[in-house]
Swiss-Prot record:
Database matches in PANTHER family: LARGE RIBOSOMAL SUBUNIT PROTEIN BL27M (PTHR15893:SF0), RIBOSOMAL PROTEIN L27 (PTHR15893)
Biological source species: Rhizobium leguminosarum bv. trifolii (strain WSM2304)
Record GO terms (molecular function): structural constituent of ribosome
Gene3D superfamilies: 2.40.50.100
Stated name of the protein: Large ribosomal subunit protein bL27
Source lineage: Bacteria, Pseudomonadati, Pseudomonadota, Alphaproteobacteria, Hyphomicrobiales
GO cellular component terms, A-Z: cytosolic large ribosomal subunit
Domain of life: Bacteria
InterPro entries: Ribosomal_bL27, Ribosomal_bL27_CS
One Pfam family cited in the UniProt record for this chain: Ribosomal_L27
Record region (Disordered): 1-21
UniProt key word Ribonucleoprotein: yes
Entry's family note: Belongs to the bacterial ribosomal protein bL27 family.
């Protein structure tokens, strides 16, 4: 006969891989067209000017410039890219 009762297996021990969400380019940072600015689930940040919104709600730059975050009166944060000035004088 067994001297000890069989130990039950734990029901824990599983976890999903992190999805690496969040802001990738912060305010004032330079970006080029195609750079990912924010990875998100749903629209925590909303697209402004010169940015696109992917089917997974990724916000990406459409033109080269600097990233700008702006909170409007409705409480939503809008992400835009301010194009760089043309050739410096």
């Amino acid at each position: 006969m067994a001297h000890k009762k069989a130990g039950g297996s734990s029901r824990n021990g599983r976890d999903s891989q992190s999805k690496r969400l969040g802001v990738k380019k912060f305010g004032g940072e330079a970006v080029i067209a195609g750079n990912i600015i924010v990875r998100q689930r749903g629209t925590e940040w909303h697209p402004g000017s010169n940015v696109g919104l992917g089917k997974d709600h990724t916000i990406f730059a459409l033109t080269a410039g600097n990233v700008n975050y702006r909170t409007k009166a409705n409480g939503r944060v809008y992400v835009s890219v301010m194009p760089k000035a043309e050739a410096a004088e």
